[in-house]
Amino acid sequence: EHIQKGLEAGVTIFAEKPIVANEEQTWQLAELIKKYGKDKVLVGLVLRYSKHARSIRKLMKEDAFGKIISIEASEHIMPWHGGFFMRNWRRKTSYSGGFILEKCCHDLDFYSMIVGCRPIRVASFGGRNAFVPDQSPILQGEKNLDVYLEYNLPGWESKEEVFDSDADIVDHQVAIIEYENGATLAFHTNMKVPDEFRRFALIGTKGMAEGDFVRGYLKAHNSHTGKKIFDENFGAAFQQGTKGHYGADQLMLKDINDYLFNNSSHPLPVGVVNCMEAGLVAMKIDESRETNQIIDLTDTWKKLDNYNLQND
């Protein structure tokens, strides 16, 4: 509704991911984008602005990896962050669209960027097994739950219960994805990981890269020689006032400012259609988890393509 009002008012909108919470809203947004143009909605898929993403795009332009064959990736968050999800309005799928949509659409978009095409089949398993009553630390002799209440939560629909939460979201999930070109992704997320990480390894016909957004490193090797062709650690920037999303928030703000106000000739690295695609993938991943079936996205992409959003 907010996006619609902004478009009707003729303004350019910046919308935080995932911009929609379900498929019905996705098709409603598609109608709006078809009418007003996809360039009128900018999106906060911030990982594409990160130094990791910039370096990977440069390496891919140099054909350092060849054809991408497979990716292994994860996004894990600390217990206090998991406690936040169990208490915040995001704990309700009707509001947030579910954990993998709300939190991990960043990652799904990032890996689609690397592969260079859409997912075509997904399968998923997961559940809520950590933030449940019988796993409360109080029952295990702990004196308090302060670590899970670290994030102050005054605000809409917030509650204080963590292990007795009325949440209907998962606290852990795995997904496997097959892309249109045959590449595959294995993805894992968990919201109770004290030494959190957001790690990935991408493997291609000519080389590989591995990195961790949290720890800051990114390394790449050539398959034929075994030699290291890239080795950087961006973590130092996190300690110098650029911590938001591993320094990517500031990079995104600069790029968007240049795009809107400084006549930048460089297109933004991500758009609203990318965000819609990542959202649909997340929704189908949850559909697989809920139905215990492999989900084919062929019809989903046909429906989206009928709006001709890539060619407006």
How should these model regions be labeled?
Residues G126-G127, V132-L139, D146-L251:
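NAD(P)-dinucleotide binding in Rossmann-like oxidoreductases
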Residues Y95-L101, E160-D164, F238-H245, S264-V272:
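Active-site rim elements
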Residues T26, A53, D107-L108, D249, ...:
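A general structural signal for well-ordered alpha-helical segments in protein cores
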Residues G37-L42, L47-F163, N292:
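Predominantly a Rossmann-like dinucleotide-binding segment in NAD(P)-dependent oxidoreductases
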Residues E1-R48, D63:
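Beta-strand-loop-alpha-helix segment that lines the small-molecule cofactor/substrate pocket
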Residues Q4-L7, A30, R57, L108-S112, ...:
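Non-transmembrane alpha-helical segments in soluble domains
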Residues G10, M86-S94, D231-F238:
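Short glycine/proline- and charge-enriched loop/turn segments
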